[in-house]
């Protein structure tokens, strides 16, 4: 059982919508006017898996669960849209969709984006509609995470690739226990909704049980989650001296962890996030 599952209750779509609209009201990440240092690094480290694992052809569509990344500055699925592919996003929050839509229009990419207001536990697509399906930090927020794997599988063409990112309970920097602490003091729901944490074996076995082949597990975002939170908090004050000090002090630390992560060693399985790939 993934860590944290006992804390979950079944959520209706309306409850999930209220939760994520509430996150928007409190999140300083969603109100940033420019990417933070770790936003750029997060995006670069995630995109390397698209390059490694996916080869979608022009005319094929990509599916992404939730639109949070595109409503902030990590913008993972821009990788596909900037290469001429259409991306369907499924998100339960009208607010997040509107924020992402404005960003995409400003970036000249909205013609390739197709947001759908829906619950990603029950995808509204015909089977075999997509060449690639992906989710990053999505399915751990719902108890029916196995249903989400099955839904992504069904929506993907035979031979298509499904990529899923989930929090890592084995994270060296104790992401799970940091979330437990934030939950205890009542701060977690202002940043995100409750989330499950997985071991590499759990998410690998879940993909195999869902019928995927060629399953591969890796990790991404090796640097401390606490530095990520600090970076995002400081980004609220881009013109203050604290932001300039952050750039001088944090940049070399993040660069060191990025170099280590790109060496693709077993240390990646201690990263903040696990990423798993399976082929339908």
Over which residues does each language-model region extend?
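A C-terminal cap/extension of S-adenosyl-L-methionine-dependent methyltransferases
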Residues: 216-280
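Conserved class I S-adenosyl-L-methionine
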Residues: 2-58, 79, 96, 108, 161-186
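Short catalytic micro-motifs in class I SAM-dependent methyltransferases
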Residues: 137-141
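Acceptor-substrate binding/catalytic loop of class I
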Residues: 185-202
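Class I SAM-dependent methyltransferase SAM/SAH-binding core
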Residues: 61-122
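A conserved beta-strand element that flanks and buttresses the S-adenosyl-L-methionine
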Residues: 134
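A short glycine-rich, Lys/Arg-flanked "PGG" loop and its adjoining helix->strand segment in the class I
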Residues: 146-161
């Amino acid at each position: 059982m993934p860590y944290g599952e006992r804390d979950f209750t079944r959520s209706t779509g309306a409850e999930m919508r209220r939760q994520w609209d509430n996150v928007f009201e409190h999140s300083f990440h969603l109100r940033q006017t420019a990417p933070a240092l770790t936003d750029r690094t997060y995006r670069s480290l995630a995109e390397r898996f698209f390059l490694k694992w996916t080869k979608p052809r022009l005319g094929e569509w990509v599916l992404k669960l939730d639109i949070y990344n595109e409503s902030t500055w990590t913008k993972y699925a821009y990788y596909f849209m900037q290469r001429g592919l259409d991306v369907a996003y499924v998100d339960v929050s009208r607010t997040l969709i509107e924020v992402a839509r404005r960003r995409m229009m400003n970036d000249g990419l909205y013609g390739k984006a197709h947001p759908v207001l829906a619950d990603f536990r029950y995808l509204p697509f015909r089977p075999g509609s997509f060449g690639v399906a992906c989710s990053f930090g999505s399915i751990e927020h719902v108890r029916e995470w196995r249903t989400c794997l099955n839904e992504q599988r069904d929506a993907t063409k035979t031979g298509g690739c499904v990529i899923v990112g989930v929090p890592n309970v084995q994270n060296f920097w104790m992401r799970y226990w940091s979330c437990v602490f934030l939950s205890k003091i009542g701060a977690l729901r202002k940043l995100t909704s409750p989330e499950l944490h997985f071991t590499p074996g759990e998410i690998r076995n879940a993909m195999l049980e869902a019928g995927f082949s060629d399953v591969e597990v890796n990790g991404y975002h090796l640097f401390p989650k606490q530095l990520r939170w600090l970076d995002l908090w400081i980004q609220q004050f881009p013109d203050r001296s604290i932001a300039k000090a952050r750039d001088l002090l944090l940049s070399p630390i993040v660069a060191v962890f990025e170099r280590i992560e790109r060496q693709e060693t077993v240390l990646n399985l201690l990263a903040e996030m696990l990423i798993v790939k399976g082929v339908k």
